[in-house]
Amino acid sequence: MPAIPLEHGLAVAGILFCLGLVGLMVRRNILFVLMSLEIMMNAAALAFIVAGARWGQPDGQVMFILVISLAAAEASIGLAILLQLYRRFHTLDIDAASEMRG
């Protein structure tokens, strides 16, 4: 089975990263911000996998495992913060929560 060309894989990773960055800057809902961060991390992981496959090195797979474990830790901590924020302020809007004191 032929491998995906390096340029195509990196282009997809770049597009995914840009989509995640736009979602991070545009959306005000914390849940969507966390999802955008996950998309950006997966784009970086895809770039590692494609680059590692191009040169036949296992380093890309090792970095992928590290990125996935970091993403899991980020998701668990982020969701815990999200739940506490919703319980305290009854909103998931970043701007509304940052203006409230308590």
From Swiss-Prot:
One of the protein's GO biological processes: ATP synthesis coupled electron transport
Membrane topology listed for this record? Multi-pass membrane protein
Q: Where is the chain membrane-spanning?
A: 6-26, 30-50, 62-82
Which taxonomic lineage is given here? Bacteria, Pseudomonadati, Pseudomonadota, Gammaproteobacteria, Pseudomonadales
Q: What is this protein called?
A: NADH-quinone oxidoreductase subunit K
Span of the signal peptide = none
Cell membrane among the record's keywords?
yes
As for subcellular location, the record says: Cell inner membrane
A single GO CC term for this protein reads:
NADH dehydrogenase complex
Q: Does the keyword Protein biosynthesis apply?
A: no
Instruction: Give the reaction(s) catalysed.
Output: a quinone + NADH + 5 H(+)(in) = a quinol + NAD(+) + 4 H(+)(out)
Q: Which family does it belong to?
A: Belongs to the complex I subunit 4L family.
Native source organism of the sequence: Pseudomonas fluorescens (strain SBW25)
Name the job this protein performs. NDH-1 shuttles electrons from NADH, via FMN and iron-sulfur (Fe-S) centers, to quinones in the respiratory chain. The immediate electron acceptor for the enzyme in this species is believed to be ubiquinone. Couples the redox reaction to proton translocation (for every two electrons transferred, four hydrogen ions are translocated across the cytoplasmic membrane), and thus conserves the redox energy in a proton gradient.
